[in-house]
């Protein structure tokens, strides 16, 4: 009789430990091992001089090329065994340029090496490269401006300006016209441009990142871009 009771206690203990591991394991992984997700991209917090921070002056006319410090990435909300987190990937292999004339960005085209975008988890990166974005067949993402960006309300101070951009975005081999808000500012001899865009996966024929029984994600993610442009 005692042996039977001991066996039951042992079984209950095993089940309890398993349940704690099932619930507590993801919590420990997300909050202590993986750590908090990276903050959203933002314009650099640097000291600016009001004498050279106003776009639209003659010194800004011409072609501006993507330089070091430019970043592109994604943010996707995940639920891992009931624990909420945000998957974040970042990359810096960006090329392209923008043409500024007066207070107008008259042309712009940018290209991103999609395979260079990485998170802090190797398994997530493998899913991103193969199952989700298929970087072998679709190695690049591109954006081409189709309407000039008018900066007529540009303030002559160090504060960022706001504008709206429209162009053709190609992701996963699918091209759609998109319109999004952006912020831009002149910092010394450079121009920084910040923007983001909500991407609905099905709209771009992108496989939903969810994995049955393991992780559930939203049906959309945020595309983040921070461009650091230098005068050509």
Q: What spans do the regions from the language model cover?
A:
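Low-complexity, acidic/polar, glycine-enriched regions of mature
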Residues: 2-232
């Amino acid at each position: 009789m005692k042996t039977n009771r001991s066996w039951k206690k042992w079984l209950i203990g095993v089940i309890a430990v398993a349940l704690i591991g099932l619930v507590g394991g993801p919590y420990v992984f997300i909050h202590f091992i993986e750590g908090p997700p990276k903050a959203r991209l933002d314009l650099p917090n640097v000291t600016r001089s009001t004498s050279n921070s106003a776009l639209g002056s003659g010194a800004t006319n011409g072609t501006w090329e993507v330089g070091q410090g430019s970043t592109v990435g994604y943010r996707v909300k995940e639920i891992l065994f009931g624990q909420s987190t945000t998957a974040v990937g970042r990359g810096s292999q960006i090329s392209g340029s923008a043409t500024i004339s007066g207070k107008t960005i008259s042309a712009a085209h940018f290209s991103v090496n999609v395979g260079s975008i990485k998170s802090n988890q190797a398994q997530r990166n493998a899913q991103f490269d193969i199952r989700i974005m298929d970087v072998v067949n679709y190695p690049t993402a591109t954006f081409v401006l189709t309407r000039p960006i008018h900066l007529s309300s540009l303030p002559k101070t160090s504060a960022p300006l706001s504008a709206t951009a429209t162009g053709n975005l190609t992701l996963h081999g699918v091209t759609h016209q998109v319109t999004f808000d952006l912020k831009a500012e002149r910092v010394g001899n450079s121009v920084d441009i910040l923007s983001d865009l909500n991407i609905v996966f099905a709209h771009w024929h992108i496989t939903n990142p969810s994995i049955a029984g393991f992780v559930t994600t939203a049906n959309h993610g945020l595309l983040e871009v921070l461009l650091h442009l230098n005068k050509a």
